[in-house]
Amino acid sequence: MTLDLSTPATAGYLSGFANEFATEALPGALPHGRNSPQRAPYGLYAEQLSGTAFTAPRGHNRRSWLYRIRPAAVHRPFEPVTGPQRLVSEFGDSADVPPTPPNQLRWDPLPMPVEPTDFVEGLVTMAGNGSAAAMNGCAIHLYAANRSMQDRFFYSADGELLIVPQQGRLFIATEFGRLDVEPFEIAVIPRGVRFSVALPDGDARGYICENFGALLRLPDLGPIGSNGLANPRDFLTPQAAYEDREGAFELVAKLNGRLWRADIGHSPFDVVAWHGNYAPYKYDLRLFNTIGSISFDHPDPSIFLVLQSQSDTPGVDAIDFVIFPPRWLAAEDTFRPPWFHRNVASEFMGLVHGAYDAKAEGFVPGGASLHNCMSGHGPDADTFEKASASDTTKPHKVDATMAFMFETRTLIRPTRYALDTAQLQADYFECWQGIRKHFNPEQQ
């Protein structure tokens, strides 16, 4: 039996966020009433995968039990992957990253590769903060690929991967089952989970936030109430599916920002059954229940929060994943686009589709921008003039768009690649230079 990545998945999904799931690809493969029986059904091995400390509070504890044909330890020793290293996971003062400028930064999309390039080969780190070794902060990567991973499997020991496809579907085989992900959806692959990516559409491009710290969770809703934003039922986790395949395969690991490879004689997608709450999942951003003002003013962008990684300071997240989806704007006598802003947090933005309502041009799908701590940003000159003269007595729908933001509590440090690449727009600052002076002390 194999996990055929050439066609869409058929096993289906389990609904809910971080639920206590139980699923089996063969009847009776899950042990009854215990996790580690003396002899597991079908001659399987029982293996626990822990995503948090054993002693984490029950409400935060994440782990799963896997019942597999061979344990994960069965592979040859790892050795470093040779060739250029485009991944970075250390962003402290001693890290090999250049000084972070206070300038607003913006990039054109990552070009598609000319040579055959799979998902792992197409990764490049644009920015980040903290340290993978210290398990805090994040790295922000882009990917551009044009071929499926062939007899090759990958996992990151550095953090969980929040994948935001911009172009091309991803058929992702994991130890837990299949995830089929398309643009407008996201996928989260937990730290340590082995996976492989097939590209059914050929070219694929997108964004990744690799979270080194506390696991992503749904935010509390406060006075919004018991429903709204990203609803738990819309998160989908794969049902168990396995393959029993032997051959000359390669296992690639990411540890402390470095890639390592090992020979492995079988597919690691040999989990016949599993139960627990530590597993991959996907979410359709088009299902986000957008909240907004129906009187006046533009609320803070925290109303667009999908997922958060909490810090040790209450109310201050290490990472926020925020989206700006299609929505109605109805506020009267209000400047409706996102306002001019300086932020104690740092903001890395991407665009999946369409246009962003604060930028008339220059910010295109697949591109990115970075506005670091206290760097002034906001609508460009054309957007400001149009929005200042628009009729706000009528509602307006912002359509054909899907922008997002990775917002962090600490400085986002661009890598040497990000500052040297030809995709960096040297003239980004010009979009604000045409903003005119309107001040007249004689006219209120």
Curated annotation (Swiss-Prot):
Residues binding Fe cation, per UniProt: H341, E347, H377
Co-factor(s): Fe cation
SUPFAM superfamilies, alphabetized: RmlC-like cupins
Gene3D superfamilies, per database record: Jelly Rolls
Keyword set includes Oxidoreductase: yes
One annotated GO biological process: tyrosine catabolic process
Active site, UniProt feature: H298
UniProt keyword annotations, A-Z: Dioxygenase, Iron, Metal-binding, Oxidoreductase, Phenylalanine catabolism, Tyrosine catabolism
Function: Involved in the catabolism of homogentisate (2,5-dihydroxyphenylacetate or 2,5-OH-PhAc), a central intermediate in the degradation of phenylalanine and tyrosine. Catalyzes the oxidative ring cleavage of the aromatic ring of homogentisate to yield maleylacetoacetate.
Self-association and partners: Hexamer; dimer of trimers.
Sequence similarity: Belongs to the homogentisate dioxygenase family.
Protein name stated in the entry: Homogentisate 1,2-dioxygenase
Gene: hmgA
